[in-house]
Amino acid sequence: MAGSSEQQLVANAAATTVAGNGSRFAVTCGLLRQYMKEHSGSNGGGGFLPAVTAMSLMTGGADAEEEAPEVRKTMELFPQQAGTLKDTQERKEITEKAQLTIFYGGSVVVFDDFPAEKAGELMKLAGSRDSTAAAAVSDAGAAAGQPCLPDMPIARKVSLQRFLEKRKNRIVVAEPLPESEKKEAESSKRAKKDDGGASWLQVNPTLSL
């Protein structure tokens, strides 16, 4: 029965394509509809598709949940291989030990494979020594800048005496000569001119005759 119906369908499809009255899509849809009706009628109206049953992919899942508590495991997407782990350890060791160069007093000192911890301690020690040296220098400069208190009055007295002496000399030079001294100075100048400027013939004006 099924073989004869299929042959009839093929013949009908060939006839329709030869006739060319409809498109291929419409013809195919009509044939498929007719085929489904025939098979549904032969199966007693129940349809030709089998019953769908749900298949449990997780076999024994319920039993496992009842017997043991829930255990979650993390999946390692990027596993670390032995080679990569070794490389990272070697790099860490290399970074921890490096070359240390010290410039001190015009000389250069180089240490190979110097630990990082020791370098940090050395830097701290150098910083503390620099701070103490700077404090000592500042204290010495402050002490040198402060004058000695006992010497201050003596220095002031000496400078005051020098100032008074200079002031006295200026006052003496600036004062005009009295009339008697002016006359004596003029007479001495005339005597010098008359005597031809001989120094041994000059008369001392201070002598009293």
Swiss-Prot record:
Primary location group: nucleus
PROSITE patterns in the record: TIFY (PS51320)
PANTHER family hit by this protein: PROTEIN TIFY 11C, PROTEIN TIFY 4A-RELATED-RELATED
Induction profile: By methyl jasmonate (MeJA), and drought and salt stresses. Induced by wounding.
Motif interval(s): Jas: 153-177
Domain notes: The jas domain (153-177) is required for interaction with COI1.
Quaternary structure and partners: Interacts with BHLH148. Interacts with COI1A, COI1B and COI2 in a coronatine-dependent manner. Coronatine is an analog of jasmonoyl isoleucine (JA-Ile). Interacts with RSS3.
GO biological process: regulation of defense response; regulation of jasmonic acid mediated signaling pathway; response to wounding
Protein name: Protein TIFY 11c
Annotated region described as Disordered, given as residue ranges: 175-209
Location of this chain's protein in the cell: Nucleus
Record field: compositional bias (Basic and acidic residues): 179-196
Task of the protein: Repressor of jasmonate responses.
